């Protein structure tokens, strides 16, 4: 007799190397808790509907719980010849409780079984990711709250542009993560759907109660179409997209961390606990954690592209191609959860070199726009003011100094309306104070922004 659940139809059994190629047990045992949870709900419903006896249901449930316990105690070895987590558990269950174990699969297919597992798994992981995003956001808010008055150069094209608050800069990533969090939250509506009871594709002739298993598994709703229930992998693609986009945001932040920690910038100092060294250069302190996060974006985005390509030509309903939905998702989930934890620890322990930042904005031309705006207050058209300031900046570059070093007489040669108050006007801290438009980098505006962020975190 074949040990295959489908062996009755076949005269020749696959060789071991074919079993190994076909099997998914090496990775889908990740779903053991979800598989057992779904099976317990199914067995409970079968008994309540009179499809199996209460005694058989209780035996099945106790057997499943014992398998789950022993698995987590490393007391069970699964077999590739049994293909997947579902058949390995069923085989072990029958071995433990006898014929009652063979009744568990009544009114169910592996098609709706694996879909149920994946919905339960994805729902739990998305909830965990949301919590990790919020935790990182909280650290960002704490750092920003302590650096409202810390001034740094803002950049465009990686060229110094205008002085901004360090708090304002770092809060940009709070809002990126807020949108990521919202996307994950919204996706739960499409993840939290029960496919159990769809069977292979067309439903079942048994008098099952899908509403009962929906309640037992704490799903928010159930699929209205059995074919859709076993064919749908949209929620996996959506989750991979949301993971990839969040990783892109972490990568952008990581790039800034890497730049800020260079000897050329010296804006921050990373903790030794989140840095590594060189095997040949004794002086090196490398931002490897940030670099790894930056590098892992290709990994998660690759999983997204792979899943899109897997589904693009599949006819309804289930196809073995869908076995490829798991490894990419499992790895992407592992990657983003690890990246969020690392990022939180990395920025929580970094030192912000406030004096260096404040001094940097006095050694560049990031206050040039302020000089143009100053001329506008003297009723000079902005485009004319822009031309005047451009010439002053060029002279400064040629002479090796900055706008605060220009003598008043020189300023007045360019335009007679420039007075001695120009030096106070060009001070970086005053540049920030004048920026009071909603969402700007001025201190009062940043504090208002922080209040909104704290309110969001408290919800």
Swiss-Prot record:
Pathway: Amino-acid biosynthesis; L-arginine biosynthesis; L-arginine from L-ornithine and carbamoyl phosphate: step 3/3
Presence of the UniProt keyword RNA-binding in the record: no
GO MF annotations in UniProt: argininosuccinate lyase activity
Enzyme class name: lyase
Keyword annotations of the record: Amino-acid biosynthesis, Arginine biosynthesis, Cytoplasm, Lyase
EC number in record: 4.3.2.1
InterPro entries assigned: Arg_succ_lyase_C, Argininosuccinate_lyase, Fumarase/histidase_N, Fumarate_lyase_CS, Fumarate_lyase_fam, Fumarate_lyase_N, L-Aspartase-like
GO cellular component: cytosol
Location of the protein in the cell: Cytoplasm
GO term, biological process aspect, one: arginine biosynthetic process via ornithine
Protein origin, superkingdom: Bacteria
One matching Pfam family: ASL_C2
Reaction equations catalysed: 2-(N(omega)-L-arginino)succinate = fumarate + L-arginine
Matching NCBIfam families: argH
UniProt similarity note: Belongs to the lyase 1 family. Argininosuccinate lyase subfamily.
Full protein name: Argininosuccinate lyase
Annotated source species: Staphylococcus aureus (strain NCTC 8325 / PS 47)
């Amino acid at each position: 007799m074949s040990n295959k659940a489908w062996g009755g139809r076949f005269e020749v059994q696959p060789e071991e190397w074919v079993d190994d190629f076909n099997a998914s047990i090496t990775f889908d045992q990740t779903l053991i808790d979800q598989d057992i949870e779904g099976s317990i709900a199914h067995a409970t419903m079968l008994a309540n509907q009179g499809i199996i006896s209460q005694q058989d249901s209780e035996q099945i449930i106790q057997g499943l719980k014992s398998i789950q316990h022993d698995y987590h105690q490393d007391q069970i070895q699964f077999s590739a010849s049994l293909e997947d987590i579902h058949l390995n558990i069923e085989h072990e269950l029958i071995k433990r409780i006898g014929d009652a174990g063979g009744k568990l699969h009544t009114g169910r297919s592996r098609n709706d079984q694996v879909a149920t597992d994946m919905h339960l798994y994805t729902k739990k992981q998305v909830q965990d990711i949301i919590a990790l995003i919020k935790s990182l956001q909280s650290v960002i808010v704490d750092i920003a709250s302590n650096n409202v008055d810390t001034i740094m150069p803002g950049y465009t094209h990686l060229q110094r542009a205008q002085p901004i608050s360090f708090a304002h800069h770092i809060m940009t990533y709070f809002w990126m993560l807020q949108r990521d969090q919202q996307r994950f939250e919204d996706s739960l509506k499409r993840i939290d759907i029960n496919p159990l009871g769809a069977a292979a594709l067309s439903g079942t002739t048994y008098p099952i109660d899908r509403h009962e298993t929906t309640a037992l598994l704490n799903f928010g709703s159930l699929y209205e179409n059995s074919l859709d229930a076993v064919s749908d992998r949209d929620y996996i693609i959506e989750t991979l997209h949301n993971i990839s986009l969040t990783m892109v945001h972490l990568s952008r932040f990581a790039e800034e961390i890497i730049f800020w920690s260079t000897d050329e910038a010296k804006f921050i100092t990373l903790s030794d606990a989140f840095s590594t060294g060189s095997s040949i250069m004794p002086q090196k302190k490398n931002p490897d954690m940030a670099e790894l996060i930056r590098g892992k974006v290709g990994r998660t985005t690759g999983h997204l592209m792979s899943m899109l390509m897997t589904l693009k030509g599949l006819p309804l309903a289930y196809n073995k191609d869908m076995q490829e939905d798991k490894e990419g998702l499992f790895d992407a989930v592992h990657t983003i959860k690890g990246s969020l934890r690392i990022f939180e620890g990395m920025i929580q322990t970094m030192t912000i070199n406030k004096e260096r930042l404040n001094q940097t904005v006095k050694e560049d031309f990031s206050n040039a726009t302020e000089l143009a705006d100053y001329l506008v207050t003297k009723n000079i058209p902005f485009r004319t003011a822009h031309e005047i300031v451009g010439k002053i900046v060029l002279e400064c570059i040629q002479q090796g100094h900055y706008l605060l070093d220009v003598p008043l007489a020189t300023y007045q040669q360019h335009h007679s309306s420039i007075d001695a108050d120009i030096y106070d006007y060009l001070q970086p801290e005053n540049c920030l104070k004048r920026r009071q438009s909603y969402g700007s980098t001025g201190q009062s505006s940043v504090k208002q922004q922080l209040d909104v962020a704290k309110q969001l975190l408290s919800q």
